[in-house]
Structures are given as C-alpha cells and as structure tokens.
C-alpha cells in the first residue's frame, strides 16, 4: 500500500480552488454540511470562501453545519453507518435548498451514501440539489458494483485497479494515529523539535 503525507496548506489551496469552481459552475449552497471529523478542515475553508462571496456579491448567507456519522460491523459482518446527529437537522431544510456535503476522502463511500440518502429521503430533496465535495476520490475499478452516490467535486481522483494500488493518505491537518518513529521524525520533529516531548511518549511504534 502506498502511504502519502498530505500537507495542510495543500488541502487549503485545493479547497479554495474547488470552492471557486463550484461557484463558477453556478451552484450557491444554502447549507454546507461538514462530515466530522475528516471534512472539518476543508469545509471550514469552503465556508469562509462563500462567506466572502456572499458579502461581495450580495447573495444570501450560507449556513455552516456539521454531521457526525460512523461505520460499524454487525454480528453478520455487514458494515452499517450510524448517524449520531446533525447540528442543523435535515427536517429544517426548505424545498429548493442547495446543499454541499464536504468530507476529506471518498473511500468506501458508505458514509457519504448514507448521508445523501438521508437528506434525500427526509425532505424529498432531488439529487441535483446536493453536491458531494471531497479532497480525494478513490475509485476502485475492480469492484463488481459501485455505490450510487459518487462525488460531484473533488481535488484528486485515484483510479485503483487492485488492492496493491490502494493508498493511505495521512492528512497532516488533523491526523496522528498510525505514525511510526521514522515518520514522526521526518514530518514533525524535524520542523519543530519541541514536538518530541509532546508526541514521542505516545506515538511512534508504541
């Protein structure tokens, strides 16, 4: 498996360019839903961009909200998604509202599919009024079936033709789990030695 360390400023810059593309495409959201935790950094940036656009171009404020969902396996080893809650419940959405649903990555896609289906079913929202936005889009070409909901906007797309081609993307904006001692030294301690006392007792081949 390929492992990539993705700098936070790369995500920031890509998110700004993607937000501009969404706007240029004529899609102005009423609500930006951030899928927590992974989508927070990218969604914050997109929300800020639309806040500026709303002020300059005199359109409606864009509500920023969050949703917490998690995947788990039941006794039959079927993966299911449980939604813990929404900071702005879908029941409050109005007919015609436009939605951006933002996450860091589309991997298995189960969580995104569950969230979009919940939005569509709870308020009868058409799919075209919901745009799925991710930084990284993994498309597994060897899967026999693809989930119905796929990203509408993404910064990078990886077509993965075999399990060996899969990649682990480490988002340096918020992730710490799974770091080796060598990775800590290269990506964290080298730039800021004070982090040695902060992280080394708990991470790095423990």
Which functions belong to the PLM regions below?
Residues 1-28:
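Active-site-facing substrate-recognition patch
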Residues 24-26, 50-59, 88-92, 120-127:
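Alpha-helix termini
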Residues 27-36:
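Short glycine-rich phosphate-binding loop at a beta-alpha junction
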Residues 55-99, 107-117:
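Short, glycine/charge-rich flexible loops or terminal/linker lids adjacent to PRPP-binding catalytic cores
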Residues 66, 101, 132-134:
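Structural beta-sheet core signal
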Residues 117-206:
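PRPP-dependent phosphoribosyltransferase catalytic core
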């Amino acid at each position: 498996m390929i492992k990539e360390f993705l700098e936070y400023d790369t995500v920031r810059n890509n998110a700004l360019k993607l937000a501009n593309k969404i706007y240029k495409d004529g899609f102005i959201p009423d609500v930006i839903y951030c899928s927590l935790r992974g989508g927070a950094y990218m969604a914050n940036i997109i929300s800020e961009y639309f806040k500026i656009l709303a002020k300059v171009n005199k359109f409606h404020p864009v509500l920023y909200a969050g949703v917490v969902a998690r995947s788990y396996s039941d006794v039959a080893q079927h993966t299911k998604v449980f939604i813990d809650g929404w900071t702005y419940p879908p029941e409050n959405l109005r007919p015609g509202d436009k939605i951006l649903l933002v996450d860091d990555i589309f991997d298995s896609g189960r969580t995104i599919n569950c969230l979009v289906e919940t939005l569509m079913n709870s308020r009868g929202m058409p799919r075209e009024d919901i745009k799925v936005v991710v930084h990284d889009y993994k498309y597994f070409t060897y899967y026999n079936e693809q989930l119905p909901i796929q990203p509408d906007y993404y910064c990078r797309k990886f077509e993965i033709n075999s399990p060996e081609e899969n990649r682990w993307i480490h988002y340096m904006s918020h992730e710490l789990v799974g770091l080796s001692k060598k990775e800590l030294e290269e990506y964290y301690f080298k730039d800021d030695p004070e982090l040695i006392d902060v992280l080394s007792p708990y991470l790095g081949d423990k």
